[in-house]
Amino acid sequence: MNLLEYEAKAIAKKYGIPTPEGVLIERPEQVNEAVEKLGLPVVLKAQVPVAGRGKAGGVKLARDPDEALELAEELFSKEIKGFPVLSLLVEKAENIQKELYLSFTIDRTNRKVVMLASAEGGMEIEELAKEKPDAIVKLPIEPEVGLKAHEAREVGKRIGLSGQLLRQFEGIAKTMYKIFEDYDAELVESNPLAITDRGLVALDFRMIVDDNAIFRHPELEASRERELSELEKEAARWGFFYVELDGDIGIIGNGAGLTMATMDVVNYYGGRPANFLDIGGGARRDRVKAAVNVLLKNPKVKVIFVNIFGGITLASEVAQGIVDALSESNVKKPIVARIVGTAEEEGKKILKEAGIPLFESMDEAAQEAVKLAKAA
């Protein structure tokens, strides 16, 4: 789950990390009060749960009140990477001398936390790694030991810091690592972490929290709800594992492995999955009906591919759920099905009587789904 910048900065401030003074606004006209409180110049920052706002035009500098109001109106009218701008963080502009980069994330290959730092902040780390890989300092951290003070200092030296700035960097690094641990984070990032007249200041602060750990942080539950689309909320109410993607072929499977394999096969044959939807084991007809309805409501979905391997899940229940959804919905979309396992013959009979195409292999079903999507 991506926290909005103002939410992440509230956590940073609570832990003592220096950040710019800021005011959150939810309407353009509120920028006037923010300017009066903060003084000029100010930076207006769109609050959306994605990286790369600057390049997308979501961060603006205002030097006078009229410009601040004009830019606020412009930003509130924007949609950034698919997210409408519902709030702005207005901050007092800092006198920046140099921009650094500092983050903690998970190295899944080596199963460790890794600290990343660079003397070249402001760029997205993926771009920096591609263009100047030697500019990034990487420090693997043993989870049972944590980040040691001398390790943080050594990283600071390698990105050119010394004296008071080095001591401050050590403190900020150790604090960011503590936040990373305390909040079950997948990413804690300051980009840029700037050298200013008052020392190091986290001009931007990002946090991604593991969705599976949200139950340990009930104060973040509202943030998670905000990040979900209406269809994702509907799926969550049924207990589905549902993630929206950019394609046009709806995917329904039972079990994460089979569902991901289905997505892979669709990709292999030139299609693009519109989602991941795992109905889980033992799904009854009402759950299957609800899953199909979610994809029928998704305007991006042109065709639905249902791939079920029945163990404790009865193929007959799956088939009846599909038929129920199609018969009760005003939205009509082609469905391709492959169902095998428990109550397979009964399930196939139900689908054949409903005129739903059935396939024996996943490959054949995927190819048909791709063909239908391209023809739609």
Curated annotation (Swiss-Prot):
GO terms for molecular function: ATP binding; magnesium ion binding; succinate-CoA ligase (ADP-forming) activity; succinate-CoA ligase (GDP-forming) activity. ATP binds at K45, G52, R53, G54, E91, E94, E99. GO terms for biological process: succinyl-CoA metabolic process; tricarboxylic acid cycle. This is Succinate--CoA ligase [ADP-forming] subunit beta. It is an enzyme of class 6 (ligase). Keywords: ATP-binding, Ligase, Magnesium, Metal-binding, Nucleotide-binding, Tricarboxylic acid cycle. Its EC number is 6.2.1.5. InterPro entries: ATP-grasp, ATP-grasp_succ-CoA_synth-type, ATP_grasp_subdomain_1, Succ-CoA_synthase_bsu_CS, SUCC_ACL_C, Succ_CoA_ligase-like_bsu, Succinyl-CoA_synth-like. Binds 1 Mg(2+) ion per subunit. The gene is sucC. SUPFAM superfamilies: Glutathione synthetase ATP-binding domain-like, Succinyl-CoA synthetase domains. GO terms for cellular component: succinate-CoA ligase complex. Pathway: Carbohydrate metabolism; tricarboxylic acid cycle; succinate from succinyl-CoA (ligase route): step 1/1. It comes from the Archaea. Mg(2+) binds at N191, D204.
